[in-house]
């Protein structure tokens, strides 16, 4: 069941759901708007001949931060990682779904490629997979609304929520845009 604005506020008031920093004006009828942080991970296109999910490629991305008061410019066809300004903490009976903002989608900005689902028990910044499918550069301003977090109540609490040792939670507690750890899904060679 998708949580309403009333349900979201009740979960926050009870301390079960965490969104920090929280601004009540960001609560929408069935979601909470989230904002863009100031850190980005850009791909180093000359470090490797290709991306191999089975290999640890630590120099695949570089962390960058625009100067204070300046935007990050995302060029057509470019893909970077960003993150939410907010740290989100979900209890073991709520899952999240990150959706883009309609106004930004109409400009050609995609906020996630495939990973818009947030497991119950997750705690951390939500990494954004930002793509510009427009024909012109898009300026991304730290602090701007970048997406909306929808919350869904599970039929029962997760037996092994994200962060428990049983599920191999690679991104629990992540801070800022976190690069892929897909290599951990492969047997070490």
From Swiss-Prot:
InterPro entries: dCTP_deaminase, dUTPase-like_sf, dUTPase_trimeric. Bifunctional enzyme that catalyzes both the deamination of dCTP to dUTP and the hydrolysis of dUTP to dUMP without releasing the toxic dUTP intermediate. The active site is at residue 129. It comes from Rhodococcus opacus (strain B4). It catalyses: dCTP + 2 H2O = dUMP + NH4(+) + diphosphate. The record marks 116-117 as: Important for bifunctional activity. The gene is dcd. Gene3D superfamilies: 2.70.40.10. Keywords: Hydrolase, Nucleotide metabolism, Nucleotide-binding. Belongs to the dCTP deaminase family. This is dCTP deaminase, dUMP-forming. Homotrimer. DCTP binds at residues 101-106, 119, 127-129, 148, 162, 174. GO terms for molecular function: dCTP deaminase (dUMP-forming) activity; dCTP deaminase activity; nucleotide binding. HAMAP family: dCTP_deaminase. One of its GO terms (biological process) is dUTP biosynthetic process. Its EC number is 3.5.4.30. Pathway: Pyrimidine metabolism; dUMP biosynthesis; dUMP from dCTP: step 1/1.
């Amino acid at each position: 069941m998708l949580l309403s604005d009333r349900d979201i506020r009740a979960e926050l008031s009870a301390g079960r759901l965490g969104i920090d920093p929280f601004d009540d004006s960001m609560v929408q009828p069935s979601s909470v708007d989230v904002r863009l942080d100031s850190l980005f991970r850009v791909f180093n296109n000359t470090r490797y001949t290709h991306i191999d999910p089975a290999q640890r490629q630590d120099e695949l991305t570089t962390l960058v931060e625009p100067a204070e008061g300046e935007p990050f410019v995302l060029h057509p066809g470019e893909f970077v990682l960003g993150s939410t300004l907010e740290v989100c903490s979900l209890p073991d009976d709520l899952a999240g779904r990150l959706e883009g903002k309609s106004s930004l989608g109409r400009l050609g900005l995609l906020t996630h490629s495939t990973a818009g689902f947030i497991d119950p028990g997750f705690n951390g910044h939500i990494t954004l997979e930002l793509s510009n499918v427009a024909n012109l550069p898009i300026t991304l301003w730290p602090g701007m609304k970048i997406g909306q977090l929808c919350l869904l109540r599970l039929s029962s609490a997760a037996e092994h929520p994200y962060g428990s040792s049983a599920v191999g939670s690679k991104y629990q507690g992540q801070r800022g845009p976190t690069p892929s750890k897909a290599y951990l899904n492969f047997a070490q060679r």
